């Protein structure tokens, strides 16, 4: 039951829904703790810049196309990263300085990490970085069929307004280079 409670608590911390039947399956002690955490997370979510979302239903190879399709009509910047990755954190921090101007030009930011990231650290990043945030089971990441991905992060993908893959960038190239790549997309 402890593993189930931990899994539920991870969803609560990510501000993701938990079914009543799932809560009811836990002991009363866990239910009280989880409901208290839900109330706390609801209050904190109001201050968060980012939004956590569940992965789309279906197979891992369907996740990325479905995520991108949700942003049709906008340029999509996908950032594969982890909390323990220094260059990933640097890239996220440096992109904050240009994010508002990019959003005005129609760029949406999607962040995808995996379960190798510490969940508390991940939630802290979600709170500070506006965009849509997903967490993928580490063993499913390869099955996502990420374009030009060679198991190294940071890894960035750019999609055009029609949802067509345009470019993959491995490693943090700096804000100026990233701005050039995004400006080239219509």
Language-model-detected regions and their locations in the chain:
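Short, contiguous acidic/charged loop-to-helix segments that flank catalytic cores in large enzymes
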Residues: 50-55, 67-69, 82-87, 112-119, ...
């Amino acid at each position: 039951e402890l593993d189930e409670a931990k899994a539920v608590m991870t969803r609560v911390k990510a501000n993701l829904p938990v079914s009543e039947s799932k809560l009811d399956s836990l002991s009363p002690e866990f239910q009280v703790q989880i409901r208290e955490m839900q109330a706390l997370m609801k209050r904190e979510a109001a201050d968060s810049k980012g939004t956590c979302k569940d992965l789309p239903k279906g197979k891992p190879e369907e996740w990325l196309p479905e995520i991108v399709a949700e942003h049709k009509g906008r340029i999509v910047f996908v950032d594969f990263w982890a909390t323990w990755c220094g260059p990933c954190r640097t890239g996220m921090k440096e992109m904050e300085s240009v994010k508002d101007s990019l959003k005005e030009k129609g760029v949406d930011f999607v962040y995808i990490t995996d379960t190798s990231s510490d969940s508390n650290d991940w939630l802290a990043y979600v709170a500070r970085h506006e965009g849509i945030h997903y967490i993928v089971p580490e063993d499913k990441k390869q099955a996502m069929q990420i374009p030009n991905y060679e198991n190294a992060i940071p890894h960035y993908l750019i999609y055009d307004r029609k949802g067509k893959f345009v470019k993959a960038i491995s490693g943090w190239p700096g804000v100026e280079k990233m701005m050039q790549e995004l400006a080239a997309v219509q």
